[in-house]
């Protein structure tokens, strides 16, 4: 019986023998295609090959493509675990032809592979063709399929198109008949939705182009796109009707069972299936650079994670489980997908962190859900407001709540949920609008109507003439900004860069050409009206400015130069991080200001000193290389074809600006290709050497799964190093040491200080035990309620020393109770102890709570033999002792 790994290899090797190039799977995050959430089919990485934009050195390709369907219209999440063939992650086997072979070869290839290499009985196979595709019908007859098993289908199921317009064509599909013991009919029959006949391969004949009027013409370059689900064909070849019975899933399910100590094939099987499937999608997404977050791809990942974690909870798991299963997954799939092994530590850390955090709210959220359902009539849907509270307060995605309700035979009021979500967004918008942080956006569309789109000249010049076409003062259009007044100036053209893409806006001056003494100081520049209007925030330093005035606009050159250096350094930093940490690194945000740069990126843990050093050295290496920074304008498709990185969620027009820099000599791209290629609208240096130098200040956590690096370039970096050098000189002078000796000298001083602190602490404890540190309450033992009781107020003793003193007093007393109060700058630390023979009569917790209350504090807790707490007023120590005595005497 072949394993899934064997089946994958057989498929790829068959097509390699037929002249196909084996192309590695593309990442689950589509390269430079912000229109697509996840890679969901084999043809995604070849989209531009089919349109002729991407010219490759092969015309035949075969792949095993990683795919995820868990968002948007391709969303299998709700059904995963409950059916035999739904998955969030799956592998799509495919063969492709880009203008090379067509139907007469594609169909025989498929038939030979499945009947000879896979040895599937021919009498179990049916095929479908589009109802007008006589050519495909005849080819199927020629390879030996009886006419009775070739079914013409007139629906869109057998006609594929890339979109409303563009490449399209008929499909042919291959179905397997599992036998009459399973209900269902062949495709095209009334019973086709049954499980007897299962599609195992789809072949698309990309032969037409469709236009807006619905008409179609034949393409000059006819192509082939096929897809066969590995899990589905694997189940068939392993003699099963259920994908979860294949060798890979069995291994993952058994690992889940071992981790939870729950039978993998009993009543709880569905939970193991969910965990096994979701482990695959979450692990591969993390390996490909997606990290859990509250929006976009990261939120889809978090939804999948939390659904799996809830099913682990239903299995009774008290501790995080998912991260313990990654090793098994890597063992099963790491050979085929090496990126999984490279990212294993990151995957495990991310899963552990996310599961630990979610478990803190999972129990409370499920209790709220149960309480809400208990209060409802039987079978009534959960109100949308309650589902929204679970989402907003406890982090329950709506589909997780729906999944939990499904098991109880209940539903959720999704309209009510949507209404609650819309209400919250409306409140957030209102709060934002009232914050004073932004001028009402509507005014800028009025400005656009008046002034038109601004022509940006800043890539080529920092000084230009223009005309003030619109002025905005106090949120309204105005004809004039008076001397000393402030407002916004919009000109027909400008060299000022408007804040966007992480780069701050330019500053500078605007002068009236008619009277150059009339000067407006530009404090900021921004883009409004969907980026079409560039507005300058000004204060009139001298004179006034009127609508229609001819003006000269001049950018602050020194500031712009510093910003350019930081922005270019950010591009180099991005690539250096990817090389040092892995391809999972993806930009999550940035700030390119004049004085510093900040870069947020996906990574689950702090960088080591060695990694930080490597990243800094790599950036400086490319700065010293002094290579030319190139910018080109091209279509988004052309940009993607050359490997330019784009940000998911960014909107791109018909043309994009591509910034390239650095020539790789070692490591990634060592063949001399460009090292960094990104879609970017910002301003950059002309040569990487213009950055000067790069100093990495440190790495910190920005949010869950996102790290932040801050750095300096140019003069700021030089000044920082000079200051650090001066500080080091001061330290070496104080220590009378050479710079290389400083670390060891400081370490010795710290060790000495710690030893002295321990000695002082021990002396204080000895003094306290001898009675010398006592004040007020004394240290004599006396009986209260028949219990030997010692109470003492201590000064110069820290609260953390009290438990050790309690234990020593108890040991000396043999039997009794102790109350110690440490005066710490007016506040009090309290500890109480009771010997084991008396804990049935009196609890140290009760003594502490009484004392803490008298000291103006709240709470206090611990064990019957030892408890601690704190109070606000150490001056009330006598009252605290009396309160404890009342507990003993009561």
UniProtKB/Swiss-Prot annotation:
Signal peptide: none annotated. Binds 1 zinc ion per subunit. Its EC number is 6.1.1.7. Transmembrane segments: none annotated. GO terms for biological process: alanyl-tRNA aminoacylation; negative regulation of DNA-templated transcription. Catalyzes the attachment of alanine to tRNA(Ala) in a two-step reaction: alanine is first activated by ATP to form Ala-AMP and then transferred to the acceptor end of tRNA(Ala). Also edits incorrectly charged Ser-tRNA(Ala) and Gly-tRNA(Ala) via its editing domain. Consists of three domains; the N-terminal catalytic domain, the editing domain and the C-terminal C-Ala domain. The editing domain removes incorrectly charged amino acids, while the C-Ala domain, along with tRNA(Ala), serves as a bridge to cooperatively bring together the editing and aminoacylation centers thus stimulating deacylation of misacylated tRNAs. This is Alanine--tRNA ligase. It comes from Ruegeria pomeroyi (strain ATCC 700808 / DSM 15171 / DSS-3) (Silicibacter pomeroyi).
């Amino acid at each position: 019986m072949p394993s899934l790994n064997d089946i994958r290899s057989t498929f790829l090797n068959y097509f390699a023998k037929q002249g196909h190039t084996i192309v590695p799977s593309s990442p689950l995050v589509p390269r430079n295609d912000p229109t697509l959430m996840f890679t969901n089919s084999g043809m995604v990485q070849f989209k531009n090959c089919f349109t002729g934009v991407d010219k490759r050195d092969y015309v035949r390709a075969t792949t095993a493509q990683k795919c995820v369907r868990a968002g948007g219209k391709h969303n299998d999440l709700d059904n995963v675990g409950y059916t035999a063939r739904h998955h969030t992650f799956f592998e799509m086997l495919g063969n492709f032809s880009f203008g090379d072979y067509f139907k007469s070869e594609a169909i025989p290839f498929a038939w030979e592979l499945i009947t000879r290499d896979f040895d599937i009985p021919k009498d179990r196979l049916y095929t479908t063709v589009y109802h007008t595709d006589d050519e495909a019908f005849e080819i199927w007859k020629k390879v030996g399929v009886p006419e009775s098993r070739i079914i013409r289908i007139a629906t869109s199921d057998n006609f594929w198109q890339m979109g409303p317009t563009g490449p399209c064509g008929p499909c042919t599909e291959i179905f397997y008949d599992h036998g009459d013991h399973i209900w269902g009919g062949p495709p095209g029959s009334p019973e086709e939705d049954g499980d007897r006949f299962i599609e195992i391969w789809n072949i698309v004949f990309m032969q037409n182009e469709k236009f807006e009027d619905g008409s179609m013409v034949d393409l000059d370059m006819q192509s082939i796109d096929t897809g066969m689900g590995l899990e589905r064909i694997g189940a068939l070849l392993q003699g099963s009707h259920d994908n979860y019975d294949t060798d890979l899933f069995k291994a993952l399910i058994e690992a889940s069972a071992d981790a939870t100590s729950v039978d993998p094939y009993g009543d709880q099987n569905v939970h193991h299936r969910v965990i096994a499937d979701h482990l695959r999608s979450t692990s591969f997404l993390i390996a490909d650079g997606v990290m859990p977050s509250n929006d976009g791809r990261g939120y889809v990942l978090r939804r999948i994670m939390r659904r799996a974690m809830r099913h682990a909870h239903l299995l009774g798991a008290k501790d995080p489980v998912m991260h313990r299963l990654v090793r098994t997954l890597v063992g099963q799939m790491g050979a085929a997908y090496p990126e999984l092994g490279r990212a294993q530590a990151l995957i495990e850390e991310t899963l552990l962190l996310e599961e630990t955090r979610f478990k803190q709210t999972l129990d409370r959220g499920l209790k709220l859900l149960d309480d809400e359902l208990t209060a409802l009539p039987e079978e009534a849907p959960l109100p949308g407001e309650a589902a929204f509270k679970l989402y907003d307060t406890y982090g329950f995605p709506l589909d997780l709540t729906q999944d939990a309700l499904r098991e109880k035979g209940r539903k959720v009021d999704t309209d009510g949920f949507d209404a609650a979500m819309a209400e919250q967004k409306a409140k957030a918008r209102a709060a934002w609008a009232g914050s004073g942080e932004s001028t009402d956006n509507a005014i800028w569309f009025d400005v656009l109507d008046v002034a038109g789109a601004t022509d940006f000249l800043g890539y080529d010049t920092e000084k230009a003439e223009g005309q003030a076409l619109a002025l905005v003062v106090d949120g309204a259009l105005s004809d004039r900004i008076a001397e000393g007044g402030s407002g916004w100036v919009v000109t027909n053209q400008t060299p000022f860069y408007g804040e966007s893409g992480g780069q701050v806006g330019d500053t500078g001056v605007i002068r009236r050409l008619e009277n150059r003494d009339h000067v407006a100081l530009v404090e900021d520049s921004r883009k409004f009206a969907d980026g079409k209007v560039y507005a300058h925030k000004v204060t009139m330093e001298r004179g006034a400015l009127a609508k229609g005035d001819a003006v000269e606009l001049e950018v602050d050159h020194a500031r712009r130069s510093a910003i350019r250096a930081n922005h270019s350094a950010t591009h180099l930093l991005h690539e250096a991080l990817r090389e040092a940490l892995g391809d999972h690194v993806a930009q999550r945000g940035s700030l390119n200001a004049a004085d510093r740069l900040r870069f947020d990126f996906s990574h689950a843990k702090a960088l080591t000193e060695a990694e930080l050093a490597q990243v800094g050295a790599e950036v400086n290496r490319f700065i010293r290389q002094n290579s030319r920074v190139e910018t080109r304008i091209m279509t988004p498709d052309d940009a993607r074809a050359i490997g330019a990185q784009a940000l998911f969620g960014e909107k791109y027009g018909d043309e994009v600006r591509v910034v390239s820099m650095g020539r790789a000599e070692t490591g990634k791209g060592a063949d001399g290709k460009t090292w960094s290629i990104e879609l970017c609208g910002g301003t950059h240096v002309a040569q990487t050497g213009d950055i000067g130098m790069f100093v990495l200040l440190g790495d910190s956590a920005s949010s869950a799964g996102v790290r932040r690096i801050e750095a300096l370039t140019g003069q700021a970096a030089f000044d920082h190093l000079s200051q650090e050098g001066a500080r080091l000189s001061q330290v070496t002078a104080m220590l009378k040491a050479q710079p290389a000796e400083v670390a060891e000298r400081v370490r010795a001083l710290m060790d000495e200080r710690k030893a002295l602190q321990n000695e002082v602490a021990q002396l204080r404890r000895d003094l306290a035990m001898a009675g010398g540190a006592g004040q007020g309450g004394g240290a004599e033992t006396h009986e209260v309620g028949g219990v030997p009781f010692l109470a003492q107020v201590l000064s110069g003793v820290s609260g953390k020393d009290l438990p050790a003193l309690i234990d020593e007093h108890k040991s000396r007393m043999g039997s009794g109770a102790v109350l110690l109060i440490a005066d710490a700058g007016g506040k009090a630390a309290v500890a109480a102890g009771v010997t084991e023979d008396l804990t049935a009569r009196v609890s140290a917790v009760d003594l502490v709570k009484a004392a803490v209350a008298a000291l103006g504090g709240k709470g206090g807790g611990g064990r019957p033999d030892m408890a601690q707490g704190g109070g606000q007023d150490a001056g009330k120590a006598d009252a605290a002792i009396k309160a404890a005595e009342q507990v003993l005497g009561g």
